[in-house]
Amino acid sequence: FRDSGLFRHVFETVLARCMKEGLVGGEGFAIDASLIKADANRQRGVCGSDATDWTDPKVATRPVREYLAALDASEPTGTQPKNISLTDPASRWTSAAGGPAFYAYSANYLIDLDVGIILDSGTTTARRTEEVETTRTMIERTEERFGLKPGRLAADTAYGSAPMVAWLVEEKAIEPHIPVWDKSAGKEGLFPRSAFTFDKARNRYICPGSHELHTTGRITSDNTILYRSRTPDCAGCALKATCCPNTPGRKIARSIHEEARDYARSLRDTPAYLQSRKDRKKVEMSFAHLKRILKLDRLRLRGMSGANDELLLAAT
């Protein structure tokens, strides 16, 4: 029964009826995620680095078997969770909501911005990277199943990473009405990266002192390209105190997806972007309805499949 996809079929049947009645515009989508507590006791857990005998009959329940099967099927990430539940190991130990940590899953909603109809629901562990990754899955599934492809996508800063913005702009031709995740402001009192002009034709930056920053073109492990100034240029520069006071020269890391990020930044002051920022509240209302009206702030079913079925049924 769990592998039948029945709840997905029911959800999509209801969505198809909503589309038939004209309740789905398909012009703009919004995406967000919210933590839902797992049915797992905070006291029944072990340290992620501890060895655990999952074959013990007292421990090897269905959620545990699902968890082990998922581990076998996935590629190792190289990181261990801080704490693992013995009753629902697929849930994630998190304190992101504030207060004491607890085991949780993330409910992910993709909604249409016209009247807030939920177009897709996905369940992930309570990790921001997985929440962002499932966005691609839901957008592609909605396009494949219903032929719906938005012109714009509204989301918060967590979805504004360079790979995500580039995927939306370059592969899907969707306007990212998303604040770009940017750490280039720099320290207070020093020139931010925006003070440097990028010369695309010559592939170099020009600093406020009119000196050039060059690159070897090598891509780092962070998917950035480093541009560096010449030490002699900086040594005699009158602006060094407000640029690189503690280093011989200035270094700028430029993302390989910077053009897509620049495009996303250019949308920030457009009327459509500002309207999307207001409309995005509809997805937050969906989560408020889930938790306050339906009272689903804690799951009843365990395991990823149980959590997915329960949240999909609630979204129907």
For the regions a protein language model found, what residue spans apply to each?
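Anion-binding and metal-coordination hotspots
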Residues: 1-316
